[in-house]
């Protein structure tokens, strides 16, 4: 009888440990992939992947509405293609995203209202073109707009 109780207790403990490990794994997965910082970084990554492919039309769609006021979609597409592809003499670039940090608030321009709950990161684009190899280093911000993370650049003087 004692042996059966011990065996039952060991099995119950094993099941409890197994379920705890599963629950912890699910929580870590959710925290990692559904956290605001991960989602913000994913939006910036998607933007620069589209830019890398020369798909400036779709990358423009990932801008915050305040960025879209700076250029029409057509002007953005033409300007990006002209500067990067023609002037730099490159077909594409590589990039990395570093240092995702949450900021309580941040302003795109000095005379603008601050965005709350912004994520700041550094994007390093590496070009290998007719003028040699060079890096373009830029602070990039992810801002929530209508439930989606959107890309914003810094225009403060």
Residue ranges and their predicted role:
Residues 57-116:
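Short solvent-exposed beta->alpha transition segments
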Residues 31-34, 62-67, 127-128:
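Second-shell loop/turn segments in exported
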């Amino acid at each position: 009888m004692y042996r059966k109780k011990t065996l039952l207790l060991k099995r119950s403990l094993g099941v409890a440990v197994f379920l705890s490990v599963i629950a912890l794994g699910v929580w870590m997965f959710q925290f990692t992939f559904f956290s605001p910082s991960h989602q913000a970084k994913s939006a910036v990554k998607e933007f620069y992947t589209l830019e890398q492919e020369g798909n400036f039309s779709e990358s423009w769609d990932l801008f915050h509405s305040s960025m879209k006021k700076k250029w029409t979609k057509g002007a953005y597409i033409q300007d990006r293609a002209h500067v990067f592809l023609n002037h730099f003499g490159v077909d594409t670039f590589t990039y990395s995203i570093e240092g995702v940090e949450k900021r309580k608030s941040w302003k795109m321009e000095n005379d603008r209202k601050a965005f709350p709950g912004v994520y700041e990161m550094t994007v390093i684009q590496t070009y290998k073109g007719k003028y040699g190899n060079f890096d373009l280093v830029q602070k990039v911000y992810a801002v929530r707009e209508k439930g989606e993370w959107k890309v914003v650049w810094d225009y403060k003087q």
